[in-house]
């Protein structure tokens, strides 16, 4: 009975690692055909923001210029002019199809992430007892570590999150999350988030050291500052 109780939190921990991926994959597959059919049938215009409109317009202008340049090096004839118009028409249809797929992708991924968040939130609430056990195990493990190991771990974590080379990692992570939700890539938004998050984390971390760590383990703070210097 005791072994069963000990394995239950471990099983719960494993489920936390693999369950989000499985739920995301399953929900995505279940919603894909429904969202595609709903969008193509309703021909809705939602989720087409200014960034998407600008992107589509830029692609169309670029396409028109390339086709026009291609015709400039040829002899002007009625046949060529007709082919030029047909080429623009075909490529325009292709651009519209791509944009339509992007809209479906946005709705699908956004809906999938919302549903997954709701399911995982409910799963976490139902497994509150297992989370409490895992938390006690983690606290006991950290308590048994030496101050030197703790200081090294804190220093490594802070360097990864708010160190000199961290902006590139933040850019990749935020870009991945941005893409996962189906949003159109925007360098300005991602750059703003990358320049903001590390500063906020750095402020929170310094407050945590000043407020709690100094009181709980002054020796750990001394070792940390020595290693950091």
From Swiss-Prot:
Membrane-topology descriptor: Multi-pass membrane protein
Keyword annotations: Antiport, Chloroplast, Hydrogen ion transport, Ion transport, Membrane, Plastid, Plastid inner membrane, Potassium, Potassium transport, Transmembrane, Transmembrane helix, Transport
TM stretches of this protein: 7-27, 107-127, 189-209
UniProt keyword annotation of Plastid present: yes
Primary residence: plastid
Pfam families to which the protein is assigned, alphabetical: CemA
GO BP terms: potassium ion transport
A GO cellular-component term linked to this record: chloroplast inner membrane
Family the UniProt entry places it in: Belongs to the CemA family.
PANTHER family the record matches: CHLOROPLAST ENVELOPE MEMBRANE PROTEIN (PTHR33650:SF2), CHLOROPLAST ENVELOPE MEMBRANE PROTEIN-RELATED (PTHR33650)
Protein name stated in the entry: Potassium/proton antiporter CemA
Annotated source species: Nicotiana tomentosiformis (Tobacco)
């Amino acid at each position: 009975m005791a072994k069963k109780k000990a394995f239950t939190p471990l099983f719960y921990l494993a489920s936390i690692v693999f369950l989000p991926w499985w739920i995301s994959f399953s929900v995505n597959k279940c919603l894909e055909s429904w969202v595609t059919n709903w969008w193509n049938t309703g021909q809705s215009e939602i989720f087409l923001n200014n960034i998407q409109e600008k992107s589509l317009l830029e692609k169309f202008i670029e396409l028109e210029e390339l086709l026009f340049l291609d015709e400039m090096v040829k002899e002007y004839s009625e046949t060529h002019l007709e082919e030029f118009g047909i080429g623009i028409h075909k490529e325009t249809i292709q651009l519209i199809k791509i944009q339509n797929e992007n809209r479906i992708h946005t709705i699908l991924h956004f809906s999938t992430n919302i549903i997954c968040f709701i399911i995982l939130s409910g799963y976490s609430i139902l497994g509150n007892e297992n989370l409490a056990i895992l938390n006690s195990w983690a606290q006991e493990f950290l308590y048994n570590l030496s101050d030197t190991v703790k200081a090294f771990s804190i220093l490594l974590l802070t360097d990864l999150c708010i160190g000199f080379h961290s902006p590139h990692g933040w850019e990749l992570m935020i870009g991945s999350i941005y893409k996962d939700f189906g949003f159109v890539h925007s360098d300005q938004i991602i750059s703003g988030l990358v320049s903001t998050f590390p500063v906020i984390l750095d402020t929170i971390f310094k407050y945590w050291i000043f407020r709690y760590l100094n009181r709980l383990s002054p020796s750990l703070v001394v070792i940390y500052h020595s290693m950091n210097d």
